[in-house]
Amino acid sequence: MGQDQTKQQIEKGLQLYQSNQTEKALQVWMKVLEKGSDLVGRFRVLGCLVTAHSEMGRYKEMLKFAVVQIDTARGLEDADFLLESYLNLARSNEKLCEFHKTISYCKTCLGLPGTRAGAQLGGQVSLSMGNAFLGLSLFQKALESFEKALRYAHNNDDTMLECRVCCSLGSFYAQVKDYEKALFFPCKAAELVNDYGKGWSLKYRAMSQYHMAVAYRLLGHLGSAMECCEESMKIALQHGDRPLQALCLLCFADIHRSRGDLETAFPRYDSAMSIMTEIGNRLGQVHVLLGVAKCWMARKVQDKALDAIEKAQDLAEEVGNKLSQLKLHCLSESIYRSKGLQRELRTHVVRFHECVEETELYCGLCGESIGERNSRLQALPCSHIFHLRCLQNNGTRSCPNCRRSSMKPGFV
């Protein structure tokens, strides 16, 4: 298959894919892969296969194609191709919740010599790195990466990237419980879709609606949460987007739990769990089990709650998500306190405080925890976050967290 023919077939596959004929598109691309001898064509078609498998939630396949793409890039001996393939490898690992590997591949991308692609893809590398740091509950590093990605987006007028970063920032602020910002950023993303997204994939609209739904639920606006989640789910079903379907089902379950309708919540948690397990989203499974545990606690069925907590704890430790571990220790603490089991209670209290230290989820000015309840937060230029009221009362001459770090004695 010659260069021109390869190009035509890739284009044909893209048209099929965009008209939701995914399986036909995959067949066309696989044929190019089998018969094409042109290395640049092979590289491009592997990129299409990586993206398609990502959107379908076939993350192990995605990783497989990303690895083949790296070999192809090495054959081309071109730093631009190498950067793009390492970014795909980073993203594949991010989807599989292999966050340390993601960070390592992102650092490889950033360490490559200055390339043409570097200017275009640097923001996407920073975004993927931020998502991985967030997956590990390293909040300062996550925020630093997201802000870097946002700068790339603004400097290059890349509104698509800006939209994706705004969704990640929504998720960041939902986790640290500044619900005002958790809603502001996905609303900004939805605005970008409305203003610039006429030719974009509908997934951008679906993504912003999903993050808005999460924030509305946390704020207690359950009707608005349901509307946004339904809109997102409709697009996810149209496009066969399994990962987003799972997230929407989890959000629906959380909305019903917030309404006290546990009968309706349970089957939605089950459906979300089924897809999360199928696609390999282990952190998603942790979030489902957290919701299930809260349902059992509301019903005062503590043993079933502890079962869910135990499964979630194993998964959370496996992926390294400290915030989930912190929440699970908090739930366990409450159960063991009510049972009067002092030894178990002590264990979870100690682990809870260790997780607070590890995540640095406390305000460096007042010493109180961050992320315990909805509070307005503000980041300093170093990306450490504080209560807004504390910064207003104390001023911001320099960051107390950075000051403390610089005063720690080094190893001699």
From Swiss-Prot:
**Covalent lipid sites (N-myristoyl glycine):** G2
Q: Which InterPro entries match?
A: Postsynaptic (IPR001237), Postsynaptic_CS (IPR018293), RAPsyn (IPR052480), Rapsyn_myristoylation/link_N (IPR019568), TPR-like_helical_dom_sf (IPR011990), TPR_rpt (IPR019734), Znf_RING (IPR001841), Znf_RING/FYVE/PHD (IPR013083)
Q: What would be one Gene Ontology cellular-component term for the protein?
A: postsynaptic specialization membrane
State the function annotated in the UniProt record: Postsynaptic protein required for clustering of nicotinic acetylcholine receptors (nAChRs) at the neuromuscular junction. It may link the receptor to the underlying postsynaptic cytoskeleton, possibly by direct association with actin or spectrin.
Q: Where are the transmembrane segments?
A: none
Post-translational modification comment from the UniProt entry: Ubiquitinated by the BCR(KLHL8) complex, leading to its degradation.
Tell me what topology the record assigns in the membrane. Answer: Peripheral membrane protein
Q: Which gene encodes it?
A: Rapsn
Primary site of residence: membrane
User: What does the record give under GO molecular function?
Assistant: acetylcholine receptor binding; ionotropic glutamate receptor binding; protein-macromolecule adaptor activity; protein-membrane adaptor activity; structural constituent of postsynaptic specialization; zinc ion binding
> Does this entry carry the keyword Glycosyltransferase?
no
Q: What is known of its domains?
A: A cysteine-rich region homologous to part of the regulatory domain of protein kinase C may be important in interactions of this protein with the lipid bilayer.
Zinc fingers (RING-type), as residue ranges, are 363-403
Phosphoserine modified-residue sites: S405
Q: What is one Pfam family matched by this protein? A: TPR_8
Where is this protein found? Answer: Cell membrane; Postsynaptic cell membrane; Cytoplasm, Cytoskeleton
Q: What is this protein called?
A: 43 kDa receptor-associated protein of the synapse
Q: Name one GO biological process term.
A: positive regulation of neuromuscular synaptic transmission
- TPR repeats at which positions? 6-39, 83-116, 123-156, 163-196, 206-239, 246-279, 286-319
